[in-house]
From Swiss-Prot:
Listed HAMAP family: Mrp_NBP35, NUBP2
Protein name: Cytosolic Fe-S cluster assembly factor cfd1
Organism: Aspergillus clavatus (strain ATCC 1007 / CBS 513.65 / DSM 816 / NCTC 3887 / NRRL 1 / QM 1276 / 107)
One Gene Ontology term of the molecular function aspect: ATP-dependent FeS chaperone activity
Gene (name only): cfd1
Family stated for the protein in its record: Belongs to the Mrp/NBP35 ATP-binding proteins family. NUBP2/CFD1 subfamily.
Any Gene Ontology biological process: tRNA wobble uridine modification
Length: 315
């Protein structure tokens, strides 16, 4: 059965490209995993799949099993101990894993995109998964319509769905940046959710200033507060804002995240020139060194409270 074992489905939407929707999807997934939840990421941005690059698994390949395609594992679950917190597993599925060459352009018409999305929703074996995050392309295109139609036939928006053993379309998280041009496009995305009867869980304002890696002071690169103003006007929950995190950028670029004090920066730079350090920890553990981890930890806790607090199965 499609989506068998998936409890909650959360769409990550943006009305405009370049707002960091895929990075928000990944950080939400990592934060939910660090709350002990098993998480999957379904990347349906068919013409610009970013998830394989962000998780550092561009060369991974999808395997076929009797139950369907097997998602690529990013990290496994970890049981709690006296020194560690519980950690859920993270797996991902993307068209990027199916391309023969990662530089291949995907030039498809609407019907082929629609068929691919339906196949992703019906032929991927996720197994037991607490949260499936769907990274969507920007705007409201054929992909969004196909996704909404298919999900509303495979899952229910009823909070009691998980108690009945069904997948629940919990809702959508909208991602914007502070500028008016971005928030105006996200308003259209919110309208799309209303028309398709998909609940909106909240708004995240990404790139809300620049966080200095030395002192932590946040400077506004663009205008500020646009996401919150829009959320208030639309009556949508504002989850919070996230400044640009240089350390997260280094993390997804495969560099070692340096959380040392700024006074040691010069010496560390000289040492790195002599010998490039290697960090063998899983991505999720290295993410803890990023400034944005604490912010997304709060987002994850809020979403869990919203979604599971509304479900009879949560007790």
């Amino acid at each position: 059965m499609p989506l068998d074992g998936v409890k909650n489905i959360v769409l990550v939407l943006s009305g405009k490209g370049g707002v960091g929707k895929s990075s928000v999807t990944l950080q939400l997934a990592l934060a939910l995993s660090l709350q002990g939840k098993s998480v999957g990421i379904l990347d349906i941005d068919l013409t610009g799949p970013s998830i394989p690059r962000l998780v550092g698994l561009e060369d991974a390949k999808i395997t076929q099993a009797p139950g369907g395609w097997i998602p690529v594992p990013v990290h496994t679950a970890q049981n709690p101990s006296s020194t560690t917190q519980p950690r859920g597993s993270l797996r991902c599925m993307s068209l990027g894993f199916l391309l023969r060459d990662r530089g291949d352009a995907v030039i498809w018409r609407g019907p082929k995109k629609t068929a691919m999305i339906r196949q992703f929703l019906s032929d991927v074996y996720w197994g037991p998964t607490d949260y499936l995050l769907v990274d969507t392309p920007p705007g409201t295109s054929d992909e969004h319509i196909a996704l909404a139609e298919q999900l509303l036939t495979l899952a229910s928006t009823d909070p009691s769905a998980t108690a009945a053993g069904l997948s629940r379309l919990a809702g959508a998280v909208l991602v914007t940046t502070p500028q008016a041009i971005a928030t105006s496009d996200v308003r259209k995305e919110a309208n799309f959710c209303v028309k398709t009867k998909i609940p909106v869980l909240g708004v995240i304002e990404n790139m809300s200033g620049y966080s200095c890696p030395c002192c932590g002071e946040v400077s506004n690169l663009f205008s500020s507060g646009g996401g919150k103003v829009m959320a208030d006007e639309l009556g949508i929950k504002f989850l919070g804002s996230v400044p640009v995190d240089v350390k997260f950028g280094e993390l997804v670029e495969g560099k070692v995240v340096d959380d040392s004090d700024s006074d040691e920066e010069e010496g560390a730079t000289q040492a790195q020139q002599q010998e490039e350090p290697v960090d063998d920890r899983p991505l999720v553990e290295r993410y803890k060194d990023c400034w944005s981890h604490s912010r997304f930890e709060e987002f994850a806790k809020t979403l869990i409270s919203q979604i599971e607090g509304a479900s009879p199965a949560s007790g």
